[in-house]
């Protein structure tokens, strides 16, 4: 274990994952802590996250990412984390689901350099890092799932990514407060499939997940 990661961090991750109903193997646990160590190290120079205190990163980044894993369905194999930033939730998704293809996209070169380093050091062969504005990204095929965490408004999230999915794609928007005001401006061809209030161990404040689809 890196000297940047403490036994308390390891215990908080294990306990929080159990509370979320997420089963972590020893390899999952090791790689998530390895990711945490890289995040702590690189954040000092690269400003990857506004969370400066390493003791807050387990709950606010790792467990927050794990809180949506039960909504990542097995039949959906090709995922995009748009506006990934420091890699949440894309890196935890790639760690927990090594047989799924996960793409993390960000327009900030420093952040994509960090994500590339994470891919190399943790040997995440299922991870693809893309340095691009989302509107300019042209994948070879639609994604099965598109997820974002505090990326933009619901209107922008759906409009900017509509060309990256189709009517079979699920869009997952991770939000803090319920975005009722944003849903009013949701494009007419998108519909909310479900809404979930999430409880993240160690995190204060509201968390919500909205799952959307495009109408046929």
From Swiss-Prot:
EC number: 2.1.1.170
Pfam families, sorted: GidB
Cellular component, GO, one term: cytosol
Lineage top rank: taxon: Bacteria
Keywords from the UniProt entry: Cytoplasm, Methyltransferase, rRNA processing, S-adenosyl-L-methionine, Transferase
MF GO annotations: rRNA (guanine-N7-)-methyltransferase activity
Binding-site positions, S-adenosyl-L-methionine: 83, 88, 134-135, 149
Subcellular location: Cytoplasm
Primary localization class, coarse: cytoplasm
Similarity comment: family membership: Belongs to the methyltransferase superfamily. RNA methyltransferase RsmG family.
Protein name listed in UniProt: Ribosomal RNA small subunit methyltransferase G
Taxonomic source organism: Pseudomonas putida (strain GB-1)
């Amino acid at each position: 274990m890196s000297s940047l990661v403490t036994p308390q961090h390891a215990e908080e991750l294990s306990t929080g994952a159990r509370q979320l109903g997420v089963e972590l193997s020893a390899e999952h646990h090791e790689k998530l802590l390895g990711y945490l160590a890289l995040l702590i190290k690189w954040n000092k120079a690269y400003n990857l996250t506004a969370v400066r205190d390493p003791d807050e990163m387990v709950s606010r980044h790792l467990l927050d990412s794990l809180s949506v894993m039960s909504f990542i369905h097995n039949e959906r194999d090709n995922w995009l984390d748009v506006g990934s930033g420091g890699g949440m939730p894309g890196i935890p998704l790639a760690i927990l689901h090594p047989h799924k293809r996960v793409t993390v996209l960000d327009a900030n070169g420093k952040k994509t350099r960090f994500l590339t380093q994470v891919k190399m050091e943790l040997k995440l062969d299922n991870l693809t890092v893309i340095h691009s504005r989302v509107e300019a990204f042209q994948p070879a095929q639609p994604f099965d799932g598109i997820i974002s965490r505090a990326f933009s408004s619901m209107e922008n999230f759906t409009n900017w990514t509509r060309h990256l999915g189709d009517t079979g794609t699920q869009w997952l928007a991770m939000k803090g407060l319920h975005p009722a005001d944003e849903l009013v401006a949701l494009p007419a061809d998108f519909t909310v499939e479900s809404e979930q209030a999430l409880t993240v161990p160690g995190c204060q404040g509201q968390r919500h997940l909205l799952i959307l689809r495009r109408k046929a």
